[in-house]
Regions:
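Intrinsically disordered, low-complexity segments enriched in polar/charged small residues
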Residues: 16, 54-55, 70, 111
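Short glycine/serine/threonine-biased micro-segments
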Residues: 21, 26, 49, 64-66
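Minor-groove-contacting beta-hairpin "wing" of winged helix-turn-helix DNA-binding domains
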Residues: 33, 67-73
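A short, flexible beta-alpha/helix-coil linker loop
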Residues: 76-78
Length: 124
């Protein structure tokens, strides 16, 4: 799963959210069940259920009684928007803090960011 510092139920939510964002789970498709997630991640089903509950609360999944959880039509847009809102605090701030500790100036930091972005295919 994701960041080990996050509670397990948050890691489950992010795991399923990843499937939505990358297109592995499409709108209308059934999401993995709590038991499937629990078995896959070797966790308690209640923990998996709590993670799925986050996605229901966020409008990414919807419950269909007797059928399971399904991806909502607007799931990907909601998930991407939520991640964009978290991005600066969760990823950029720690990277900038480390750059300051290492004594990078602005130009060097920009060069490093460009180099990494290019190596990951961002500018193609």
């Amino acid at each position: 799963m994701n960041a080990e510092s996050d509670p397990l139920f948050v890691q489950v939510a992010r795991f399923v959210e990843d499937l939505v964002v990358d297109g592995s789970l499409e709108p209308g498709q059934r999401a993995p069940s709590t038991n499937e997630l629990a078995a896959f991640h070797e966790i308690n089903p209640a923990t998996a259920r709590k993670g799925l509950g986050i996605l229901v609360d966020d409008g990414i999944l919807e419950k269909r009684r007797g059928l399971g959880m399904f991806v909502t039509p607007e799931a990907r847009e909601r998930a991407v928007q939520a991640r964009r809102e978290r991005y600066a605090g969760e990823y950029l701030a720690p990277a900038i803090d480390e750059a300051v500790r290492l004594g990078y100036d602005r130009a060097t930091l920009h060069t490093l960011i460009d180099r990494v972005a290019e190596s990951r295919g961002m500018y193609q």
